[in-house]
């Protein structure tokens, strides 16, 4: 099972359950319009039995509302400035042998050239993404693999005591 933070229109969740046998995804989406579109897409593709979708803010979401209590995977693709908060809240729900995937860590390549970003808000956002990247790579509790795929992805595993 996978917990996804940031459903958007449900595409990632639908791809996961369509390509992995007997897989379930539980997902949280803040934006009502995207949530409703995701519900529609999930229903039209007959995937309601495999995808549980919640509407709400993942940062204030009551964990008691989650139907699944332990996950094999956490997929974070929501508000980029909140990545560390999402990670800290939801990573404890991932099984010891599970993974966390964090998407869009290059932020259109801007992460590599922060000083040349003119827009103040964009610069602040990119700095927060960079702080998360630095924090997770320096965190001794996790093993982190970075992949230059798409807009940059990290695969994070809990470090196993030797």
What feature does the model see in each segment?
Residues 1-162:
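S-adenosylmethionine/decaboxylated-SAM
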């Amino acid at each position: 099972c996978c917990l996804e933070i940031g459903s958007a229109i449900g595409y990632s969740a639908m791809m996961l359950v369509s390509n992995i046998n007997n897989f379930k995804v539980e997902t949280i989406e803040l934006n009502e319009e995207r949530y409703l579109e995701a519900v529609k897409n999930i229903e039209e593709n007959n995937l309601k039995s495999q995808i549980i979708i919640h509407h709400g803010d993942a940062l204030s979401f009551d964990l008691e509302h989650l139907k699944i209590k332990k996950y094999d995977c956490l997929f974070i693709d929501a508000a980029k400035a909140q990545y560390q908060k999402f990670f800290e809240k939801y990573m404890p729900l991932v099984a010891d042998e599970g993974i966390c995937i964090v998407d869009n860590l290059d932020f259109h390549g801007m992460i590599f050239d922060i000083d040349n970003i003119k827009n103040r808000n964009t610069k602040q956002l990119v700095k927060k993404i960079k702080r998360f990247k630095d924090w997770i790579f320096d965190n001794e509790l996790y093993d982190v693999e970075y992949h230059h795929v798409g807009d940059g992805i990290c695969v994070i595993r809990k470090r196993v005591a030797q």
